[in-house]
């Protein structure tokens, strides 16, 4: 459950380390984002010579949450951190590598590139 002001780790090699959610996209008064939702973020920490700089405003897709994902069989998949992957204006990942596991819920036609780059799909 990601909301405005939530801090997330960045699960890719774009150069950002931590981002902060500034808007949950998909509705005028939408409050929470879960795995697979697109959010607007600002970069709070970045490494030198990365693709993004501190202060950049970008789109991101949530790939892991502490709250978890409920599957149709009743099981819940929870993670140790809240993480996102940065996207460009065309909703494609700007990075070439993804770190850590991602969930099967991202397998829609929109995020197959992220699923294919991920080392593990749960």
Curated annotation (Swiss-Prot):
GO CC annotation terms, alphabetical: cytosolic large ribosomal subunit
Gene Ontology molecular functions: large ribosomal subunit rRNA binding; structural constituent of ribosome
Coiled coil ranges: none
Highest rank taxon of the organism: Bacteria
Gene Ontology terms describing biological process: translation
Function as written in the Swiss-Prot or TrEMBL entry: Binds to 23S rRNA. Forms part of two intersubunit bridges in the 70S ribosome.
NCBIfam families linked: rplN_bact (TIGR01067)
PANTHER family associated with the record: 50S/60S RIBOSOMAL PROTEIN L14/L23, LARGE RIBOSOMAL SUBUNIT PROTEIN UL14M
UniProt name for this protein: Large ribosomal subunit protein uL14
Native species: Psychrobacter arcticus (strain DSM 17307 / VKM B-2377 / 273-4)
Name of the gene this protein is made from: rplN
């Amino acid at each position: 459950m990601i909301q405005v002001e939530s801090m997330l780790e960045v699960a890719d090699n774009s150069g950002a380390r931590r981002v902060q959610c500034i808007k949950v996209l998909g509705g005028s008064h939408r409050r929470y984002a879960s795995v697979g939702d697109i959010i607007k973020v600002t970069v709070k920490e970045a490494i030198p010579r990365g693709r993004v700089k501190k202060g950049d405003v970008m789109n991101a897709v949530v790939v892991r949450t502490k709250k978890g994902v409920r599957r149709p069989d009743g099981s819940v998949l929870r993670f140790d951190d809240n993480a996102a992957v940065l996207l460009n204006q065309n909703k494609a990942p700007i990075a070439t590598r993804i770190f850590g596991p991602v969930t099967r819920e991202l397998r829609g036609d929109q995020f197959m590139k992220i699923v294919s780059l991920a080392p593990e799909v749960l």
